[in-house]
């Protein structure tokens, strides 16, 4: 059974006194073999840090101590310094847990634009996704939790080992993102998936009504995932950029970070408003 509540503990969020340009929310499902990678990525985020125009917010569920924490990442801060709230164990595969994190972020750190990053393992949509992925890379890819026995509509992201391997399947993700749209009164500006196999047209089609731009990889990601220091330093320096511009920068930063070590990777940004055009073209082509 999925958990639907959060036991609050620790400190309280410091409500932002003004509206920022961006709130960058990272939902980190680290209750699995990515726990250490989560801490490294938080350290990368702290190299940039939040500013008056950019809030960097994280919710991390860890496997090591079975706690969930919320952070506002500051420059030079990180896991030990920036924790705002601490809860008991949560199930990252429960849509309500994701929704609660976003609502907390929106209520306390309002902004002109919002980016939501889903951080974990992903299993995309297509049955043959694993066979199409890149071969062994220099660093271990995030592949150990792929679930290819599920029906396509049930392929997932944000797996939680201590909640029976529960995850957000594509239908749950569609519903919770629709709820977030209602909360915002508009589409989410940018949805990022720092996970394997998630940036497929089939996934984007299900999410098209809730997000403006989608960023992710259609094949496996290495364990190191996104280069958050580079991504967020640019956002902090240019906080007035729109979602499409920011998405292009994420893609360029990701590809450049692996080019130097010679790894085969993919990352792309999709204009979700054009997904219906792709769908119509596919239908006409195959009729």
Regions found by a protein language model. Give the residues of each.
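N-terminal extension/subdomain marker
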Residues: 1-112
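Surface-exposed loop and adjacent secondary-structure segments within mature catalytic domains
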Residues: 58-90, 113, 117-167
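Structural recognition of the beta-strand scaffold that forms the well-ordered cores
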Residues: 23-27, 55-60, 114-118, 189-193, ...
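Terminal, contiguous helix-loop blocks that mediate binding/assembly
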Residues: 2-17, 140-287
């Amino acid at each position: 059974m999925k958990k639907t509540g959060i036991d609050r503990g620790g400190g309280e969020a410091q409500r932002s006194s003004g509206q920022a340009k961006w709130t960058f929310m990272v939902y980190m499902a680290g209750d699995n073999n990515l726990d250490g990678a989560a801490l490294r990525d938080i350290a990368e985020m702290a190299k940039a840090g939040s500013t008056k125009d950019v809030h960097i917010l994280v919710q991390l569920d860890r496997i090591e101590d079975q706690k969930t924490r919320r952070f506002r990442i500051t420059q030079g801060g990180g896991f030990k310094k920036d924790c705002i709230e601490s809860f008991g164990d949560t199930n990252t595969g429960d849509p309500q847990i994701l929704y609660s994190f976003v609502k907390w972020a929106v209520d306390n750190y309002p902004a002109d634009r919002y980016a939501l990053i889903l951080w974990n393992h992903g299993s995309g949509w297509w049955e043959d996704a694993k066979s199409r992925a890149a071969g062994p890379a220099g660093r271990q890819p995030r592949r150990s939790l792929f679930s290819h026995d599920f029906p396509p509509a049930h392929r997932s992201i944000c797996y939680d080992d201590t909640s029976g391997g529960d995850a957000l399947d594509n239908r749950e993700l569609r519903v919770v993102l629709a709820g977030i749209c209602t909360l915002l009164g508009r589409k989410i500006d940018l949805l990022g998936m720092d996970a394997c196999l998630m940036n497929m047209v089939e996934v984007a089609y299900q999410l098209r009504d809730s997000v403006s731009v989608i960023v992710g990889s259609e094949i496996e990601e290495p364990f190191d995932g996104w280069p958050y220091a580079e991504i967020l330093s640019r956002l902090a320096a240019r906080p007035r950029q729109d979602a499409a511009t920011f998405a292009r920068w994420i893609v360029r930063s990701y590809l450049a970070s692996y080019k130097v070590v010679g790894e085969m990777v993919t990352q792309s940004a999709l204009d979700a408003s054009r997904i219906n055009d792709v769908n119509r073209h596919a239908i006409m082509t195959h009729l």
